[in-house]
């Protein structure tokens, strides 16, 4: 082992020989190159990304001395791409833990067996020319030691922040060598206990910047606006490096590229240039207007894009440029299924474009600063950003003192350093509206000092930190102002809607605006309570917005031993401790395919609201929910459908509606005089022209209304008009035979064993009543109660089966039964009345009594299986994707066609999926159109799959699901909502199946679709 100072366990030594933190910028040699902003085009910039030599050690104690020497032979080492995480390349293993530290909680000490990665990179320097050469690391996890040409240069930590070294004195013309030792853990790891995959290495870009001895080292842009926002002042504070004077010129261009003003000054060490801007075009997330400030010093040209905007709180409301805004946000981690924490620029932009396409206007950089170029994109595309310090000590909660590190004086410097480095690097970005002190670290004096330093440095932004407001630990809403007075907003995670309405808004002692920095945990099939939150947020100005947890499923793309690709989560690599699939909690899949939850969010936070005024006369109310722009960029499209077929449509292209205003529009459709079908009006809003984030015609929002036509009067099918049936009774069964069918009903089990129509058996096993669903991720808490009550292990007990009535045209059989699990009393006692008619129709009427004092039911309905080949689905209900009682705002009611496979949502952890709320009828057929038609006497929930609920319950990953040939159909009276209880409040009562008495009627009819008019059957009813 070689000797090196043990900085990694010394919180008093955070950096050795690093440059002072400063604003991010890249100098260029021409205005054109500066404007394009491709840093590789700058002659002052040299990327060191690429292939490095790499050697991994399980413990730093095994590292041999001399690896950093110029003549060291590293040819036997492996090659590793930088930037990367070494765990993504087979060294060590990815490790997911949410709260728990993966080592004993004994700060500042980390395990003796501390894994180390050694990196060597040779590079060529033509000449030095008495210049400064800065080596920049934009992200290294967790800490690193640096040597250049065999000489120790320095040390640094803070994984998600820039570390910069002036290495000019260590360079020589020709070949040079960098050697870096990265350690998996350091004392700073106690401050980086974020809910994420734990990965190590040089994971962000590495590059050289060559600068003159006297050069601009820092720039601080401040914009000020007068009270009525008609006059702006841009202040540019410039800091020089090199100790002598420099002639600085600055040129300001407006958003159209026209020159507004030019300033020039001779500066010594520091100086300020000011620009007065009359009638500035302001920056906001809807119109992200950016001015261009070119700063010239010698050969260097630096371009900073400047946004004029004013952030303030008045009357307990967050204002941007004097307007109350709603933050429609998400929490975003750096996560890539193949690259880990290494995020290419195009991937950042794709994320942001996808957010814009789904009406998201705000981002919390949970829980660390992002790549600086990410913030440039936020400036340009238009997002409100909460920039969060690289700080979380959640694991301290496990040892009984959540705030122990936040109160510990030996970590004060580390806390301040993380705030310092973030603010200094990111201070010039218009998109940043709040500085966040970190996440889930208790609350202590170290936080207060961070906040006070940031306010002193930059009073133009708000200070955020949620951890101070935990009601059980630190904050009394009645007396807590003094302890948290350094915080500008009241922030909470996952509060219930009732807490927001009945406690926060009613408390007269708390005047700050409320921001939900996390809510609606988007894990798996969910979230299901978005609409309820946003109804309340829109209603109250003090409720300033909310950030969904979280943007993407964190997962590692890997393979099984036999080569099947799958997305891994905690524990799949043998990592301990782990939190399983709790990292799979995003609005998008790891490959950024949207979950249905993202579509739900899009329509709920849409910037246009449509309400019915008088649908008989075509009157609707349109409200512009944008804060700054009118609706001239949108077209209002409308269509009227009858039974799922469009019968009328048009568009209104003149909806130039001012922000936060409403207007009545009259749509020229006709209402039929007689109710001869199901009529629905759909209003949607699409882009007039191409935008940077979406194409012309892209739908921004929609709303659907059922037209007041009245209930369709069904035509009668009399029993007398039907063919006769014969009934044969045996000790075991009832055999019911008609002209085209033969049904066999088991007297012992109380249900059909075959439904044969035209010689084809329509079922492959006996139908059964069911209450179980494969638990969703958001059922993780209620699941324990369900299983304790036996919902997952139901047996059906038949008390009696008897014929209630019969004649030559029909037979009615009543089955008395119960559903229950072992140990517990039955969950349900019920009667099922099965009536078979000469037409082949089966009418099911079930009356169920739910046991008292038990948890609400996951579902209640009939499950049946159809044989192989029944793959084609047609239904009239909410689609085209899955819909639930509390998760349906991204769906609409119409007629849809699908296949069984297409109706399965392949969540990374298998769970309940693919149900369709408020279905009126559905068919499941083979390729010839032969199959079953299901008609609800009242709307029902409909689901088809090649997996049973038990199959899905027992599978940990999709590849473990064994696809059945048969088609499993669930026809449910109701399915409980999905909510967001994996981390949020319990499912709201109105979305629970909690009825004590259930009445459910369903008509089942074998069909050959070519031989019938489907709607004629749907709009018929059997009468005496």
Each language-model region and where it sits:
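Extended substrate-binding grooves/exosites of carbohydrate-active enzymes
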Residues: 2-38, 89, 97, 151, ...
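Accessory beta-strand-rich segments of carbohydrate-active enzymes
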Residues: 3, 9-15, 38-39, 53-57, ...
């Amino acid at each position: 082992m070689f000797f090196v100072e043990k900085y990694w366990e010394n919180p008093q030594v955070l950096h050795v020989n690093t440059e002072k933190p400063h604003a991010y910028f890249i100098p260029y040699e021409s205005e054109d190159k500066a404007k394009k902003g491709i840093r590789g085009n700058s002659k002052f910039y040299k990327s060191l990304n690429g292939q490095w030599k790499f050697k991994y050690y399980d413990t730093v104690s095994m590292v041999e001395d001399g690896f950093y020497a110029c003549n060291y032979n590293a040819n036997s080492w492996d090659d590793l791409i930088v930037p990367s995480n070494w765990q993504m390349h087979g060294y060590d293993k990815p490790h997911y833990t949410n709260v728990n530290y993966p080592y004993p909680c004994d700060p500042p000490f980390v395990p003796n067996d501390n894994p180390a990665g050694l990196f060597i990179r040779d590079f060529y320097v033509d000449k030095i020319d008495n210049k400064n050469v800065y080596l920049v690391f934009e992200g290294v996890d967790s800490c690193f030691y640096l040597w250049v040409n065999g000489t120790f240069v320095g040390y640094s930590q803070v994984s998600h922040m820039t570390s910069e070294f002036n290495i000019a004195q260590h360079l020589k013309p020709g070949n040079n060598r960098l050697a870096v030792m990265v350690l998996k853990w350091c004392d700073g790891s106690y401050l980086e206990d974020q809910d994420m995959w734990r990965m190590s290495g040089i994971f962000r870009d590495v590059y050289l910047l060559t600068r003159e001895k006297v050069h601009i080292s820092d720039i601080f842009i401040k914009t000020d606006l007068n009270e009525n926002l008609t006059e702006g002042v841009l202040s540019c504070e410039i800091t020089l490096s090199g100790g002598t004077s420099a002639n600085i010129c600055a040129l300001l261009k407006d958003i159209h590229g026209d020159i507004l003003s030019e300033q020039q000054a001779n500066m010594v060490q520091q100086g300020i240039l000011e620009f007065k801007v009359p009638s500035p075009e302001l920056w906001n997330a809807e119109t992200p207007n950016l001015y261009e400030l070119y700063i010239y010093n010698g050969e260097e040209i630096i371009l900073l894009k400047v946004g004029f905007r004013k952030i303030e709180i008045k009357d307990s409301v967050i204002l941007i440029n004097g307007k109350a805004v709603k933050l429609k946000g998400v929490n975003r981690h750096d996560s890539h299924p193949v690259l880990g924490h290494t995020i290419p620029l195009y991937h950042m932009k794709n994320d942001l474009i996808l957010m814009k396409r789904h009406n998201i206007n705000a981002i919390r950089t949970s829980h660390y600063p992002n790549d600086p170029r990410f913030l440039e994109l936020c400036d340009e595309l238009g997002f409100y950003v909460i920039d969060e310090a690289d700080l979380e000590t959640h694991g301290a909660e496990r040892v009984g003192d959540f705030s122990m590190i936040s109160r510990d004086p030996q970590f004060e410097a580390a806390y301040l350093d993380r705030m310092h480095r973030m603010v200094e690097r990111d201070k010039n970005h218009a998109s940043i509206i709040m500085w966040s002190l970190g996440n889930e670290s208790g609350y202590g004096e170290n936080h207060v000092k961070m906040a006070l330093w940031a306010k002193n440095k930059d009073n133009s932004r708000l200070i955020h930190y949620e951890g101070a407001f935990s009601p059980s630990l630190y904050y009394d809403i009645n007396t807590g102002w003094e302890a948290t007075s350094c915080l500008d907003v009241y922030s909470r995670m996952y509060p219930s809607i009732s807490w927001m309405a009945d406690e926060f808004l009613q408390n007269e002692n708390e005047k700050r605006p409320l921001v939900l920095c996390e809510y609606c945990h988007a894990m798996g099939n969910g979230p299901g309570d978005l609409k309820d939150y946003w109804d309340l947020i829109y209603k109250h100005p003090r409720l300033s917005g909310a950030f969904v947890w979280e943007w993407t499923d964190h997962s590692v793309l890997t393979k099984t031993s036999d080569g099947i690709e799958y997305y891994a989560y905690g524990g799949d690599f043998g990592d301990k401790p782990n939190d399983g699939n709790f990292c799979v909690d995003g609005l998008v899949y790891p490959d950024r395919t949207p979950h249905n939850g993202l579509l739900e969010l899009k329509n709920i936070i849409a910037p246009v609201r449509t309400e019915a005024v008088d649908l008989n006369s075509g009157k609707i109310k349109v409200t512009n929910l944008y804060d700054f722009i009118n609706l001239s960029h949108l077209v209002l499209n409308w269509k009227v459908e009858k039974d799922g077929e469009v019968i009328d449509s048009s568009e209104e292209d003149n909806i130039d509606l001012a922000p936060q205003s409403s207007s009545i529009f009259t749509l020229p459709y006709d209402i039929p005089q007689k109710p001869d079908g199901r009529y629905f009006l759909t209003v949607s809003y699409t882009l007039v022209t191409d935008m940077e984030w979406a194409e012309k015609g892209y739908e921004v929002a929609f709303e659907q209304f059922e037209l007041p036509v009245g209930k369709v009067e069904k035509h009668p099918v009399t029993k007398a008009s039907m063919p006769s049936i014969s009934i044969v009774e045996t000790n075991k069964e009832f055999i019911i035979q008609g002209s085209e069918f033969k049904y066999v009903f088991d007297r012992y089990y109380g249900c059909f064993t075959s439904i044969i129509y035209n010689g084809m058996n329509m079922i492959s096993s006996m139908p059964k009543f069911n209450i179980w669903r494969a638990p969703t991720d958001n059922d993780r808490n209620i699941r324990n109660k369900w299983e304790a009550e036996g919902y997952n292990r139901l047996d059906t007990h038949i008390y009696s089966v008897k014929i209630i009535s019969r004649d030559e045209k029909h037979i009615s059989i009543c089955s008395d039964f119960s559903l229950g699990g072992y140990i517990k009393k039955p969950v349900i006692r019920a009667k099922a009345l099965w009536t078979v008619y000469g037409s082949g129709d089966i009418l099911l009427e079930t009356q169920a009594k739910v046991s008292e004092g038990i948890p609400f039911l996951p579902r209640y309905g009939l499950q049946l299986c159809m044989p192989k080949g029944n793959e084609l689905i047609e239904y009239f209900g909410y689609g085209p994707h899955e819909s639930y009682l509390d998760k349906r705002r991204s769906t609409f009611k119409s007629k849809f066609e699908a296949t069984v496979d297409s109706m399965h949502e392949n969540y990374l952890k298998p769970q309940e999926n693919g149900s369709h709320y408020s279905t009126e009828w559905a068919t499941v057929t083979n390729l010839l159109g032969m199959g079953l038609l299901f008609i609800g006497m009242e709307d029902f929930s409909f689901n088809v799959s090649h997996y049973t609920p038990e199959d899905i319950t027992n599978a940990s990953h999709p590849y473990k699901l064994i696809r059945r040939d048969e088609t499993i159909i669930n026809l449910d009276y109701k399915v409980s909502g999905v909510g967001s209880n994996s981390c949020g409040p319990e499912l709201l009562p109105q979305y629970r199946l909690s009825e004590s008495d259930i009445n459910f009627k369903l008509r089942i009819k074998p069909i050959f679709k070519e031989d019938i008019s489907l709607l004629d059957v749907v709009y018929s009813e059997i009468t005496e």
